[in-house]
């Protein structure tokens, strides 16, 4: 758990990854449009900083919800790029908690599909392994989950934050590194215009998911 809240508002690129409690995601889809679930913690990575700020782990070690979310709002209010892997999920949850994001919202999952549309998997771990030679270390997380008798993928919120922090930070750091690779590939393949269109469409698609689409 970080001991301070750095001023990241002016960072040119900020990667963000949420840990959530989303109990019905497999049967009903993401819970954020109906607030079926919660943000458990926020991981942030910039050039020079990475931290995980836990707010709703069921077994303690949490930081003050309002202080963390006020800081998150300040962080995302700057003009820099905000980078997510599967942005509609994380941005949806941030929106559900009243967070308004300024600057470009970049989805590395979408960018990855543009760079290589023939992949079998667009998971962060798979992309990191194939393109960066890096994956998240999940050994300690799985050991802790085994001791607590929980599913490390679906029930992270049941673990104390100290077991989740490093894993969550790695998600944000890997997302930031992946974007550095994708930027050069988008330029090399000359698909900037397609990527820019996808990026501009994102807020529209998110609004449609949040409010629904009228069908006659």
Regions found by a protein language model. Name each.
Residues 193-216:
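Extended, well-ordered alpha-helical scaffold/bundle regions in very large, multi-domain proteins
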Residues 37-40, 44-187, 197-199, 205:
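Active-site-proximal helix-loop-helix substrate-binding element of RNase H-like nuclease domains
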Residues 1-35, 58, 65-76:
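Long, highly charged low-complexity segments
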Residues 17, 107, 216:
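Conserved acidic catalytic centers in enzymes
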């Amino acid at each position: 758990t970080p001991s301070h809240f750095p001023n990241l508002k002016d960072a040119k690129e900020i990667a963000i990854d949420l840990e959530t409690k989303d109990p019905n995601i497999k049967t009903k889809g993401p819970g954020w449009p109906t607030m079926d679930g919660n943000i458990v913690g926020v991981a942030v990575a910039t050039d020079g900083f990475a931290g995980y700020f836990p707010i709703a782990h069921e077994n303690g070690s949490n930081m003050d919800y309002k202080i963390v979310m006020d800081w998150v709002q300040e962080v995302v209010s700057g003009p820099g790029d905000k980078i997510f892997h599967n942005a509609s999920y994380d941005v949806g949850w941030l929106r559900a908690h009243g967070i308004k994001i300024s600057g470009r919202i970049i989805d590395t999952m979408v960018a990855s599909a543009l760079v290589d549309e023939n992949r079998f998997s667009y998971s962060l771990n798979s992309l990191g392994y194939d393109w960066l030679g890096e994956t998240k270390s999940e050994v300690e997380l799985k050991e802790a989950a085994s001791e607590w008798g929980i599913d490390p993928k679906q029930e992270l919120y049941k673990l104390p934050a100290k077991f989740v922090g490093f894993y969550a930070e790695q998600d944000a750091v890997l997302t930031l590194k992946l974007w550095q690779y994708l930027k050069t590939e988008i330029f090399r393949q000359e698909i900037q215009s397609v990527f820019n269109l996808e990026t501009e469409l994102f807020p529209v698609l998110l609004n449609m998911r949040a409010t629904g689409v009228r069908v006659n």
